[in-house]
C-alpha cells in the first residue's frame, strides 16, 4: 500500500509539471506585485530599461518596403511598469492599481513601423507635364497602419485579438510648425488567459504580402 501511494504521488507530480507550461504566467496581480512594478517604472533608469530587454525585439532594416523596427510583447506586469515609466509626474501606486484593475489581464503586442526610402509618406506619384505643381502625388494617410496585418500564434493556432489600435508618428516640425508622417505605433491587445506560458510566434504582414516574424518565450517573462 505504501508503495502504491509513492507511485501515485510520483504520477501526480509528473502530471503537474507536464501541465505547468499551460498555466498562465503572472496574471491576477497582487497589490504587492503592482506596487513593485509601479516603483520599477517610476525609476525610469537602467534597471527599468534592463527589465524590458527580453520583452523587446529589434529587427533588421529591409532592402525595400516598410521597416518593422521594433516588436514588443508585454505581459500584464510589464504593462504596469511601462505605463508607470511613461507617467512619472503625479502618478501614484494607487492609480496604477486602479488602472490595472480596469485594464484587466491582457497581453499587449506593440509594433513600430518606420518609413524608408522605398516606403515613405508619398504613396504614389504619376507622371505630370508640370512637375512644379506636383500633380499626381498621393500622401499616405495617417491610418496607413491598417493596411498591415498583425497576429500571434502558438503551435500554429492564431489567437484572436480583443482590440487593435494605432498612432501615427510624425517627424520634427518645420519652420511652419508642420511635421511629416514618418511611421506609426500599433497596439494589439489579447486576453492573457488565452495565451499559455509557452513560445509565441509573432507575425506582421505588410501591404505587399511580406511576412516579418519573430518569437518570444513566455516562460522567461513575468
Language-model segment annotations:
Residues 23-222:
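Conserved functional micro-motifs across diverse proteins
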Residues 8-18:
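Bacterial N-terminal signal peptides
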Residues 1-9:
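Bacterial N-terminal signal peptides that target proteins for export
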Amino acid at each position: 500500500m505504501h508503495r502504491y501511494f509513492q507511485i501515485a504521488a510520483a504520477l501526480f507530480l509528473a502530471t503537474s509539471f507536464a501541465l505547468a507550461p499551460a498555466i498562465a504566467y503572472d496574471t491576477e496581480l497582487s497589490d504587492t506585485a503592482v506596487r513593485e512594478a509601479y516603483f520599477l517604472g517610476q525609476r525610469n533608469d537602467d534597471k527599468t530599461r534592463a527589465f524590458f530587454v527580453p520583452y523587446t525585439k529589434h529587427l533588421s532594416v529591409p532592402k525595400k518596403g516598410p521597416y518593422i523596427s521594433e516588436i514588443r510583447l508585454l505581459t500584464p506586469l510589464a504593462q504596469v511598469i511601462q505605463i508607470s515609466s511613461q507617467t512619472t509626474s503625479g502618478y501614484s501606486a494607487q492609480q496604477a492599481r486602479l488602472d490595472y484593475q480596469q485594464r484587466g489581464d491582457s497581453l499587449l503586442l506593440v509594433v513600430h513601423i518606420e518609413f524608408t526610402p522605398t516606403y515613405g509618406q508619398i504613396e504614389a506619384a504619376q507622371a505630370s507635364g508640370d512637375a512644379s505643381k506636383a500633380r499626381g502625388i498621393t500622401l499616405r494617410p495617417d491610418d496607413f497602419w491598417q493596411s498591415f496585418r498583425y497576429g500571434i500564434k502558438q503551435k500554429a493556432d492564431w489567437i484572436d485579438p480583443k482590440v487593435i489600435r494605432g498612432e501615427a508618428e510624425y517627424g520634427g516640425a518645420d519652420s511652419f510648425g508642420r511635421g511629416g508622417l514618418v511611421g506609426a505605433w500599433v497596439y494589439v491587445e489579447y486576453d492573457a488567459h488565452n495565451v499559455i506560458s509557452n513560445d509565441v510566434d509573432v507575425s506582421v504582414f505588410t501591404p505587399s504580402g511580406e511576412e516579418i516574424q519573430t518569437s518570444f518565450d513566455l516562460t522567461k517573462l513575468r
